[in-house]
Amino acid sequence: MTGPLPAPVSLVDIHCHLVPGVDDGARTTEDAIAWLESFRDSGIRRVVTTPHLSASHVAGSWRERIESRYLDLKEAARERVPEIELSLSFELRIDEPEADLSDPALGLGGGALLVEFPQLILPAYPDLMLSSVSDQGWRPVLAHPERYTGIGRSYECIERWREAGVVMLVNVGSLLGDHGPEAERVARRMLAAGHVDCLASDHHGRESRSTSLRMGWDRLAEAGHAGIADLLTSANPAALLKGKPCEPVQGTDLSSPLVKRLRRMVRGGSE
């Protein structure tokens, strides 16, 4: 392949860290704008930036600081990257199951709330933590389920959560091996089982964490799954933001067409 595949110009990234100076994401507004320009050039047209926020601090001064920094970024983006529709939500760390999450401004849109478990570790009572979100009227969207330590040994959790209505949002970087072999293995298992609802970049506005959503689209398309790529990076994220259900995604082998043919030959199948 000599160049990038022709992706649609309507990719939707619902998890990234571009609000400057508030978490481990972008450091400055200029940095964030530069990354938004690169997003635009790769076909992304909708971005929800999701800085970290602990459930125990949803009403504190830290959230006010985040919102102030976001407004500065929004103004700059309106002038310099008008092609991108930018909005603010949060990656809500569930550190307090009793936290009041009634403020609709916390959500991604459409009644969906992006959540994560603390410290990238599968907690002792994950179902209770997720139900504390859904019990307050939200549709939980679990950030990078493939990355939590111990999830590979407790994969049945993913199946159970999906049955309970939790949306599985996988990092593109996990499929590409950026988060280590275990996260890649679980992400590929989820993809093969049809347990991935959406992909997102989890871009952190700096070179060390700069995996883009377009990279995920390209990787799937290169493996012969452009239709699946469209669902995971465009149609399903857009539906989620509108409060509509995600389309079911069939199980997908991320191996290249050549590798698949070789496997069939080894098994004695026809090409």
Where are the language model's segments positioned?
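Mid-to-C-terminal alpha-helical segments outside catalytic/metal-binding sites
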Residues: 218-271
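Charged helix-capping and loop-helix junction motifs
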Residues: 28-31, 65-67, 128-130, 153-159, ...
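An N-terminally biased module of ancient metal coordination in phosphate/nucleic-acid-related enzymes
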Residues: 1-81
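Non-catalytic positions within long, well-ordered alpha-helices that form the structural scaffold/packing
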Residues: 40, 134, 191-192
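Active-site neighborhood of phospho(di)ester-bond hydrolases with catalytic His/Asp-centered motifs
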Residues: 12-14, 48-50, 87-90, 141-143, ...
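Extended substrate/RNA-proximal surfaces in nucleic-acid metabolism proteins
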Residues: 59-169, 252-271
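Active-site beta-loop-alpha junctions enriched in small/polar residues
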Residues: 17-19, 52-53, 89-95, 118-120, ...
